[in-house]
Curated annotation (Swiss-Prot):
Comp. bias regions, Basic and acidic residues: 58-68
Modified residues (Phosphoserine): 81, 89
Species the sequence originates in: Human papillomavirus 21
Cross-link (Glycyl lysine isopeptide (Lys-Gly) (interchain with G-Cter in SUMO)): 512
Family per record: Belongs to the papillomaviridae E1 protein family.
Matches recorded under Pfam families: PPV_E1_C, PPV_E1_DBD, PPV_E1_N
GO CC field: host cell nucleus
Annotated protein name in UniProt: Replication protein E1
InterPro entries for the chain: Helicase_SF3_DNA-vir, P-loop_NTPase, PPV_DNA_helicase_E1_C, PPV_DNA_helicase_E1_N, PPV_E1_DBD, PPV_E1_DBD_sf, Rep_E1_papillomaV, Znf_lg_T-Ag_D1_dom_sf
Biased composition (Polar residues): 586-603
Post-translational modification: Phosphorylated. Sumoylated.
Segments forming domain SF3 helicase: 405-555
Length: 603
C-alpha cells in the first residue's frame, strides 16, 4: 500500500487522539459507495411480495354513503321547522347539534340559499351548543330572512287584508281606514293614493324615494318595522291597478302585500297625521304640501278669510263663461274648488242643488235681458267675435251658386229678414232630400245662437216659447200638418205684428216673432191650399244633391268661420249698423257685472 498522506505524527500524541483520518483510494470509488449505501442490516423493511386488490368498491360506497348522510342531516337541521322539534320533545329544542353559522353580509341576494353556498359557508363555522328562547330570533335570520318569514306568514293567513290592517295599526298606532276613504272599483282614478306595503327590502325602499319623484308632485314615505307607509300625489290621475303595477315592479313585492286607498281630503285629523309625520326624522318627504293638507293645517291669510258662500260670484262666473245648463254649472264650478274659495264654500254647503238652480235661472234672465237690449247688428257682431279662427265667405257663395240660387236675391231676402221687415222676415229653403237644406240653415242658426223648434211638440201650447228667447229661429222639415198649423195660427206672426205668446209658468206675453228660417220638401208657392202664406214667405230652391268628397267629407264646409267671414265681408251690403255709432260717442263700455264689488277691487 502507499504511504499514508498527511502530517507527520508527533510523539506523545498519537496514543491519546487521532486528529487526522486515513485516506484510501478505495473510498473514492463511486460504485463501491453506492453498493455500500444500498446494503441494509434491517430485514423486511420493504414488502416485495405480491399485493391483493381487496374490496375497494365497497369502501368507496361506504365513504359516499357517509358523506351523503352528513349532507342530509345538515339540510334537515337547516329547513326543519322549530315547531316540529318542539312537538317531538321540548328538551330536544334546547339542544343544537349543528354549528351556528356566522353572520356575513353578502353582496348578492341570490347567494342567500342553495346547497353549494351552504356547504361553502360552513367551513367557517364554530361548533357550539345553543339553548335559545322560544321567542328569540337569530341575528342572521333577522338580517337576511326577515322578508321571507313575513311573506310566508302573510301567505298562511286566510284574510291577508285583515292581517295587514292589524300590522299597520300595531306599527303606526292608527287605523288604515282612519286615514283613507274607500274605493271599491279598481278602475276609479285619483291623483292621491295612500299605500301600506308589508315586508319591503330596505334597499328597494330607499331607491323608491328617488324613482317616485318622476311620477309624483308630493311624496311621503315612512317605514316602521316590516310596514312601510306611502302617501303619493301623482302628477296625473291613476287607478288602483296602475298604482299596484307600478309599486310591485319598483319594490319587488306581491300585490297581496299592498293595501291602497285614496286619502281623506276633508278630515283635519288625517291631515294633521301627514303634517306632523312629515316633521319627524323617520319620514321622507318630497315636494310642497298638497292643498288639502295645507288648507287644514297651515294657518295663513287664506284660512282667515271669510268662508261664506257668495252666490253673486257664482252667477258672475256662469254668466262670463256662458253656462246656462244646470249640469254644466254644477260640474264646472266644482272643478274650480282647488283654486276658488267660493267654490269650496259652495261644496261645503248643504243646499248645493238649490243654488245651482237659482244660478242657472239668474244667468238665463241676464242673458235674455242682454239679448233684448241688443239690436240685430250688435247681436251678430257679438256672436261672430266669439268665433275663433278664420274662414272664407266664398264657400257659402259657391254653395248657393251650386244650388242655382241667385246670390243677389238671397242677400236681399236675408237683409229683409234680419231687419224684421213686415212680411219679409221668413225664408223658406225647399227641395228634394239630401240637398243640404238642413246643413245650410243649421250652420247659420249655430253661429247666431238661434233656437230650433220641432213640430213634434205642437200638442203643447208652449212649443213656440223658444221664439221669445232668441234673435233667429228655425223650424226644420216642415210637413203638411205644420203648414196647416202655420196657415191657421201663425199668419199674424209672419206678418211681423205683435202676437200673444203663451209661456210656461207665466202669463201670455206680448212679443214679435224673430227672424224665422224654414226647410221643407214642399214648395209652398205651388200649393193652392196655402195661398195666404205665399206673400209672407220668401222661398229658395235647392235642387242639387249635396256634394261629398272621396273621403266622405263635405265639398262645401259651412262652418262658423265661413259665416264669420260672410258677415264681415258683406256687412255693408246687409245694411248692418256700425258698432261705433251704437255706442256712446265711441267710448268703451264696462262689461256686465252682476256681483257686488269687493273692497279692494280696481276701478
Amino acid at each position: 500500500m502507499a504511504d499514508p498522506k498527511g502530517s507527520t505524527s508527533k510523539e506523545g500524541l498519537e496514543d491519546w487522539c487521532i486528529v487526522e483520518a486515513e485516506c484510501s483510494d478505495v473510498e473514492n470509488d463511486l460504485e463501491e459507495l453506492f453498493d455500500r449505501d444500498t446494503d441494509s442490516d434491517i430485514s423486511e423493511l420493504l414488502d416485495d411480495n405480491d399485493l391483493e386488490q381487496g374490496n375497494s368498491r365497497e369502501l368507496f360506497h361506504q365513504q359516499e354513503s357517509k358523506e351523503s348522510e352528513e349532507q342530509l342531516q345538515k339540510l334537515k337541521r337547516k329547513y326543519l321547522s322549530p315547531k316540529a322539534v318542539a312537538q317531538l320533545s321540548p328538551r330536544l329544542e334546547s339542544i343544537t347539534l349543528s354549528p351556528q353559522q356566522k353572520s356575513k353580509r353578502r353582496l348578492f341576494a341570490e347567494q342567500d340559499s342553495g346547497l353549494e353556498c351552504t356547504l361553502t359557508n360552513e367551513e367557517d363555522v364554530s361548533s357550539e351548543v345553543e339553548v335559545p328562547a322560544l321567542d328569540s330570533q337569530p341575528v342572521a335570520e333577522a338580517q337576511l330572512g326577515t322578508v321571507d318569514i313575513h311573506y310566508k306568514e302573510l301567505l298562511r293567513a286566510s284574510n291577508n287584508k285583515a292581517i295587514l290592517m292589524a300590522k299597520f295599526k300595531e306599527f303606526f298606532g292608527v287605523g288604515f281606514n282612519d286615514l283613507t276613504r274607500q274605493f271599491k272599483s279598481y278602475k276609479t282614478c285619483c291623483n292621491a293614493w295612500v299605500l301600506s306595503v308589508y315586508a319591503v327590502h330596505d334597499d328597494l325602499l330607499e331607491s323608491s324615494k328617488q324613482l317616485l319623484q318622476q311620477h309624483c308632485d308630493y311624496i311621503w314615505i315612512r317605514g316602521i318595522g316590516a310596514m312601510s307607509l306611502f302617501l303619493l300625489c301623482f302628477k296625473v290621475g291613476k287607478n288602483r291597478g296602475t298604482v299596484h303595477k307600478l309599486m310591485t315592479a319598483m319594490l319587488n313585492v306581491h300585490e297581496k302585500q299592498i293595501i291602497s286607498e285614496p286619502p281623506k281630503l276633508r278630515n283635519v285629523a288625517a291631515a294633521l297625521f301627514w303634517y306632523k309625520g312629515a316633521m319627524g326624522s323617520g319620514a321622507f318627504t318630497y315636494g310642497p304640501y298638497p292643498d288639502w293638507i295645507a288648507q287644514q293645517t297651515i294657518v295663513g291669510h287664506q284660512s282667515t278669510e271669510a268662508s261664506a258662500f257668495d252666490m253673486s260670484a257664482m252667477v258672475q262666473w256662469a254668466f262670463d263663461n256662458n253656462y246656462l245648463d244646470e249640469a254644466d254649472i254644477a260640474y264646472q264650478y266644482a272643478k274650480l274648488a282647488p283654486e276658488d274659495s267660493n267654490a269650496v264654500a259652495w261644496l261645503a254647503h248643504n243646499n248645493q242643488a238649490r243654488y245651482v238652480r237659482e244660478v242657472a235661472s239668474m244667468v238665463r234672465f241676464y242673458k235674455k235681458g242682454q239679448m233684448k237690449e241688443m239690436s240685430m247688428s250688435e247681436w251678430i257682431h257679438t256672436r261672430i267675435n266669439e268665433v275663433e279662427g278664420e274662414g272664407h265667405w266664398s264657400t257659402i257663395a259657391k254653395f248657393l251658386r251650386y244650388q242655382q240660387v241667385n246670390f243677389i236675391m238671397f242677400l236681399a231676402a236675408l237683409k229683409d229678414m234680419l231687419h224684421s221687415v213686415p212680411k219679409r222676415n221668413c225664408i223658406l229653403i225647399y227641395g228634394p232630400p239630401n240637398t243640404g237644406k238642413s246643413a245650410f240653415t243649421m250652420s247659420l242658426i249655430h253661429v247666431l245662437r238661434g233656437r230650433v223648434l220641432s213640430f213634434v211638440n205642437s200638442k203643447s201650447q208652449f212649443w213656440l216659447q223658444p221664439m221669445s228667447e232668441c234673435k233667429i229661429a228655425l223650424i226644420d222639415d216642415v210637413t203638411d200638418p205644420c203648414w196647416i198649423y202655420m196657415d191657421t195660427y201663425l199668419r199674424n206672426g209672419l206678418d211681423g205684428h205683435v202676437v200673444s205668446l203663451d209661456c210656461k209658468h207665466k202669463a201670455p206675453m206680448q212679443t214679435k216673432f224673430p227672424a224665422l228660417l224654414l226647410t221643407s220638401n214642399i214648395n209652398v208657392h205651388n200649393e193652392v191650399n196655402y195661398r195666404y202664406l205665399h206673400s209672407r214667405i220668401k222661398g229658395f230652391e235647392f235642387p242639387n244633391p249635396f256634394p261629398m268628397k272621396a273621403d266622405n267629407t263635405p265639398e262645401f264646409e259651412l262652418t262658423d268661420q265661413s259665416w264669420k267671414s260672410f258677415f264681415t265681408r258683406l256687412w255693408n251690403q246687409l245694411e248692418l249698423s256700425d258698432q261705433e255709432d251704437e255706442g256712446e260717442n265711441g267710448e268703451s263700455q264696462r262689461s256686465f257685472q252682476c256681483s257686488a264689488r269687493s273692497a279692494n277691487e280696481h276701478l
